[in-house]
Amino acid sequence: MLEEIKYKLKRKLFRQMEAYDITLDELKEKQMKGAEIIDVRNKREYDESHILGSINVPEYQINESFEKIVPNKNKEIVVYCSSGFRSASAYRRLRCLGYMNVWNLYGGLENY
């Protein structure tokens, strides 16, 4: 247990907030304005808990299925995972697919 706490703390210390990261308050604001909230964790994690109204698209499936789920590349999208690492990767993938209004929930569900 102590090792897990040390590991999580170390990850948080070395993960700096990026320009594409948003806070919990910003997420709530974007959600109220109709942004798509995408949980990029696996289905088991999503089934255990998730942000109300979010859609589950595991990070490893983004390239193959995301354009069918959200065809509008101008739609505002917020991605999240447990801690912010997988969602940061999902953010980069979505940008490569042409989605321009993408944001990452800083710290993921750990901060929710």
Predicted regions and their residues:
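Flexible, polar/low-complexity N-terminal or interdomain linker segments that lie immediately upstream
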Residues: 1-48
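Conserved beta-strand scaffold positions in the cores of enzyme catalytic domains, especially
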Residues: 21, 37, 54-56, 102-104
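Membrane-proximal soluble helical/coiled-coil segments
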Residues: 44-45, 55-56, 62-64
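Catalytic cysteine-centered active loop of the rhodanese-like fold, especially the PTP/DSP P-loop
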Residues: 67-112
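Short, flexible helix/strand-to-coil boundary loops that buttress conserved ligand/catalytic motifs
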Residues: 31, 50, 66, 106
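Short acidic active-site motifs
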Residues: 26, 61-66
